[in-house]
């Protein structure tokens, strides 16, 4: 009899304890519930729900405190406060306004079990890149991003979060030492070129991809910072700019006619060695073609001279970037 009474007295406490354990499990393991709606809702349903939440504007009166009740156990979440987006003393930081909800959208009923979706970012997000980027662009609207719409990255459905990290002390893509690693995680062909024997000093962090390119888009074909390829090259190689008294058309028109800007197995990042490189244009007058015959059975008919001896146009035409010498018409001096 005493044991049965004792059990009756313990039951309410047991029920309360189990209920509290269930609630605590939501808070202690936020990663298990943070995007549980993905398994139950299609991407279209997620977007429709988010649109409805924004229309209702049901933001939490407690701001980040509401979010941290569950998410403070996540190291990734808390790393936000180590970076600029989590700065509480900056008027430009999300923390100065709607805080977490400035990026992830209104809380709504999300904290009632975590079933109602929030905006998520990155590869695991079911939201389109356009939807994700619209959140970032609502703040980041400076002149460097004026050409984002229609840029190479925009047309490839690249999300801001594909390159940028927010919940970190320092975004790797904004560091000169790690920017190239971020870019070449997608641009693998360029990475291979950068590791060839002749290349720009990106491997040693003496320059970065953004020294030449604007990743947010520009009016040029390769999203360059300057209006043209040549203007981009001249920003470092000013001695090649000209105008020269005697000019070489490939130099004035397009540097990449001869050079591979990301790297090459040939000296000076040339696409191929001379004379083959020169013969791509100078093949009809017979002069340059004669040198090539030296590698065939007809080589004995070419004759011995400085040109055929080294089989390089550069033995004579040394000033290929142009000449200011009065008698430099043939770019020989």
UniProtKB/Swiss-Prot annotation:
Q: Does the keyword Magnesium apply?
A: no
User: What SUPFAM superfamilies does the entry give?
Assistant: Multiheme cytochromes
Q: GO molecular function: any one?
A: oxidoreductase activity
One protein family per Pfam? Cytochrom_c_NrfB-like
Q: From which residue to which does the signal peptide run?
A: 1-34
InterPro entries found in the cross-reference section? Cytochrom_c_NrfB-like_dom, Decahaem_cyt-c_DmsE, Multihaem_cyt_sf, Multiheme_Cytochr_ET, Paired_CXXCH_1
Lineage top rank: taxon? Bacteria
The UniProt keyword set, sorted, is: Signal
Kindly provide the name given to this protein in its UniProt entry: Multiheme cytochrome MtrA
Species of the source: Shewanella baltica (strain OS185)
Q: Which gene encodes it?
A: mtrA
